[in-house]
């Protein structure tokens, strides 16, 4: 009974003070596995059922499923999801990622929670395009990711979630041997199969 009491006390202390029982690398691995799984299952299902019809729909679906899947991890480690994020490492960069999973200091005196962010654990850019010529807009977001790796001090993984409603083979948007993306970028891709035009959701890890 004493041991159980000690464990429960430590768990309460973790939630209150943000004392982590996992390393950042372990937390980011959990987040990474969840993001990849959600993309290939829940997001594909939502798209096929016509719940995702534009970029805002994609954003809200990702937010919902991440909250649902990772709720215990978020609570234990004081993690929150921010959209159109422009604080912490991004405050003076001129960039505003579509979505960020970040840790907050629960004891911060900041007026707003965005000011209480201590570090980012995942950064996501999103794109939903329907025309073949929209490829250039997708490539532009990859250039943003490249700028993040070159100009910002980020230790987390970067994700590019793209739904491109055109027929295509499962492929990557950036070269597989691109040095700037190696070990940093994960592509969450979706397109349509040739002929049948069925959705295909897949992941490429650089």
Model-flagged regions — what are they?
Residues 75-116:
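Active-site metal-binding core of divalent-cation-utilizing nuclease and nuclease-like domains
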Residues 99-101, 119-130, 145:
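Conserved catalytic cores of phosphodiester-cleaving nucleases, focusing on short active-site segments
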Residues 129-134, 167-170:
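Short acidic, S/G/P-rich loop/turn micro-motifs used as interaction or catalytic elements
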Residues 150-206:
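Domain-level recognition of nuclease-like catalytic cores that cleave nucleotide substrates
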Residues 122, 142, 162:
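A domain-level signal for the structural core that forms small-molecule/cofactor-binding pockets
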Residues 2, 7, 15-68:
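Charged, often low-complexity linker/regulatory segments
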């Amino acid at each position: 009974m004493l041991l159980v009491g000690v464990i429960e006390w430590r768990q309460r202390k973790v939630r209150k003070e943000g004392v982590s029982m996992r390393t950042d690398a372990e937390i980011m691995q959990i987040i990474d596995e969840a993001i990849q799984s959600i993309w290939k299952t829940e997001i594909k299902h939502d798209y096929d059922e016509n719940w995702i019809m534009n970029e805002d729909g994609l954003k809200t679906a990702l937010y919902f499923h991440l909250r649902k899947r990772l709720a215990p991890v978020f609570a234990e480690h004081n993690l929150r999801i921010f959209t159109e994020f422009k604080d912490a490492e991004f405050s003076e960069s001129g960039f505003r990622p579509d979505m960020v999973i970040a840790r907050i200091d629960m004891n911060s005196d900041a007026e707003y929670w965005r000011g209480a962010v201590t570090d980012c654990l995942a950064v996501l850019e999103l794109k939903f395009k329907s025309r073949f010529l929209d490829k250039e807009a997708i490539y532009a977001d990859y250039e943003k990711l490249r700028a993040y790796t070159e100009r910002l001090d980020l230790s987390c993984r970067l994700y590019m979630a793209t739904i491109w409603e055109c027929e295509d083979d499962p492929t990557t948007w950036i070269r597989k041997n691109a040095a700037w993306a190696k070990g940093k970028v994960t592509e969450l891709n979706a397109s349509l199969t040739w002929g049948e035009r069925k959705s295909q959701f897949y992941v490429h890890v650089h």
